[in-house]
């Protein structure tokens, strides 16, 4: 456990303030700091609020931001530095991008937020402890499933140019017409949670080796899901793949047969227990991340 872990922990990220991420001991920093982001400005802003730079810095980033607007000056942070990296399926050579950044801006440990399947590969490239402890510091909107959910397979997500696999699968389901199927796009996790709660089953199509937010969003909404992919996406977290509310399919035909079988027993499907996501308390997350 690093010195200073009990001091309130700044979470540096690039997005808007996220109320769901808040928990005791965490303060969000970064969205209003301007560009380019640097630790000197971060320290100055935090010291105005009485924070100590010996605290743990939780730095959330992805390969796109590492290339376009990386946080600089990490050596000026006097406490432990934990980098939480998401979206390691984005861009060209994302692992090399991460390794090059860490050579220039050292951190004491790395968390892969949604890429447990890539832990072994990333460890080979980095000199610091690397783990994946999903869903890290994230939290998701909860929902109460309706009493009589729609017997439709719901897919929520983008089908844009960066998502050809999803687009192909959705088009295949729509063209074949064997399943009652609905595809929608949403503008917020809260909107998605409300939709999940109205349906008996959700289709989750991860990208490459990314477990994705949707895996946990659906759990938080209390609805079973079918993941189109390999259970190896969970890495060493086998319990996630073996949950009673998570089903797996690796082909369009297998998906259709699985869903038709589940919809043939609607009472059994509705009775499936859906435990909440395995959320981490902040102190426990830091302890696990910094373990030798």
Regions found by a protein language model. Give the residues of each.
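Residues in well-ordered alpha-helical elements
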Residues: 216, 252-253, 283
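C-terminal helix of von Willebrand factor
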Residues: 121-123, 257-262
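A charged, aromatic-enriched C-terminal amphipathic alpha-helix characteristic of glycosyltransferases
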Residues: 256, 263-292
């Amino acid at each position: 456990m690093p010195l200073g872990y009990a001091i309130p922990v700044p979470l540096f990220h690039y997005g808007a303030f996220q109320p769901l991420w808040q928990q005791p001991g965490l303060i969000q920093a970064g969205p209003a700091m301007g560009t380019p982001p640097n630790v000197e400005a971060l320290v100055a802003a935090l010291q105005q609020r009485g924070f100590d730079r010996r605290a743990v810095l939780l730095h959330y980033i992805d390969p796109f931001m590492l290339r376009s607007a990386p946080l600089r000056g990490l050596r000026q942070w006097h406490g432990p530095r934990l980098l939480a990296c998401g979206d390691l399926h984005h861009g060209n050579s994302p692992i090399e991008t991460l390794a090059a950044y860490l050579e220039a801006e050292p951190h004491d440990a790395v968390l892969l937020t949604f890429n447990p399947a890539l832990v072994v590969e990333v460890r080979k490239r980095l000199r610091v402890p690397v783990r994946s402890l999903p869903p890290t510091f994230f939290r998701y909107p909860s929902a109460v499933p309706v009493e009589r959910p729609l017997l439709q397979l719901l897919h929520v997500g983008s089908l844009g140019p960066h998502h050809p696999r999803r687009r192909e699968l959705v088009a295949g389901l729509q063209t074949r017409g064997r399943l009652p199927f609905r595809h929608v796009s949403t503008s917020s996790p809260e909107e998605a949670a409300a939709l999940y709660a109205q349906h008996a089953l959700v289709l989750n199509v991860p990208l490459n080796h990314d477990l994705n937010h949707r895996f946990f969003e659906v759990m938080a909404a209390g609805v079973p899901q079918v993941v189109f992919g390999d259970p190896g996406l969970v890495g060493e977290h086998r319990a996630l793949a073996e949950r009673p509310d998570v089903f797996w399919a690796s082909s369009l035909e297998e998906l259709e047969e699985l869903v038709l079988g589940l919809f043939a027993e609607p009472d059994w499907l509705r009775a499936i227990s859906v435990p909440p996501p395995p959320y981490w308390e902040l102190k426990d997350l830091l302890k696990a991340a910094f373990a030798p």
